């Protein structure tokens, strides 16, 4: 197994926190399972007067073997602890290891949450989830960090893509500051890139504004690649709420593309539903509902019958439902 990354050091009175170290990759194997990837180290906190938090380290990649090794989780982003400072970004999760035999493939690592902002400062972005290989579970995206008093919430990390399994969900956006700031946008859902099973991952929800500010937009749903039978795209995330005093609701994320069907007469995949728009609380406009995902095309087969070419056409899938307005 790969070693874990070390944590970054915290700053003193002022200055940025140190970044966390990356986890090591696992070693490949032939007749036993591949090694696990190491965890990413956490980022250090910023200075007590001012300074940004350090970024979290990335998780190591799981290795290939008779069974696949697990990918390491990303390290948490450090907080901006002082009067002002931005939270550090969360580390990305490591890819899971594929498998060359009956044991299961390795699970991918999760993206880590972004650090909180200081009294004035934005929250850090969440890390992206790791890719699921050969049917392994993909890693979910990390949540964006919250702002403290004045600042915007961090964006959620993207969900990991997958082959032969479901795409992972995107992370939620962080909340805006208690006095002013917008919510962060939700992360994109993971796509399904290959295989006859699995649907696109859900987009992350947008972060809420707390007093004055707009809600964050929901993340887009993951797209679905073609398969023998059409599979569905992922749903978009809902938009965040506007501030209690003023602010618009966030827009819902669009749904993912439905997958094309390849088999004769098979129906294409349904597009993912659009996310709902976020509400406005007191003064402001509600968010728009997200667009539904496009449908996948139906499968076809052309064959010569008595010298004539005939075609069997599968019906296209259904478009995704449009999200409700806030």
What are these regions (language model features)?
Residues 1-326:
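Glycine-centric low-complexity repeats
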